Amino acid sequence: MSENLTGRIIKQISGYYDIAVNGTTYRTRGRGSLRNDKITPLVGDFAAFQPGEGDDEGYLLKVLPRHNALVRPPVANVDQAVLITSAVEPDFSKNLLDRFLVYLEGHDIHAEIYLTKTDLTKPQRLTKIRQDLAGYTKIGYPVFAPDKPFDPTILAQVQASFADKLTIFTGQTGAGKSTLLNHLVPGLD
């Protein structure tokens, strides 16, 4: 019987949990005791588990205490969020941006702001949006507002900001989350 290990859940599907430890991924199933104790493991959870032998999956034994947890998406122990907001289609909204930031701060999640669709708005409107975003920079939020869409220099700064951190990408529907992710990680499914 193998020794128990501790790692982070990186994927959950149909009762299976993939747990990463030092670059190795182990497939596990939750023990019945988790269900009996009404514990639902989430992606991002740190967990104790018993690795499987050969091709057999192991067993997730215990979910360790969480720093934070979100319902949508269901994820735990989030270090930071990249909050995507668009200049247009949908229109920029300080009110909505504030609501997202309050939600993230309430869950002790560091936020960074990324402005998309800067090429689709009028220059005067973009100037006003950038003035609004400067206020967020003044209170400590990193803001990425590229002049041209998906500027490689800005993308490199965003990538550097989430190295070695569990980062979620969030924002209103249509703001460009998937498009940004596909530019950050080409070939992402």
List each language-model region with its residue ranges:
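Conserved beta-strand/loop subsegment of P-loop NTPase cores
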Residues: 78-85, 107-118, 140-145
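Short flexible coil/turn linkers enriched for glycine and charged/polar residues
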Residues: 3, 11-13, 107, 137-139, ...
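N-terminal accessory targeting/assembly segments
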Residues: 1-94
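Canonical P-loop GTPase G-domain recognition
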Residues: 120-175
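Residue-level signal for inorganic ion chemistry
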Residues: 44, 104, 116
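Histidine-anchored nucleotide/phosphate-binding helix
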Residues: 95-110
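Catalytic P-loop NTPase motifs of RecA-like helicase/translocase cores
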Residues: 91, 121, 187
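A conserved segment at the C-terminal end of the G1
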Residues: 178-189
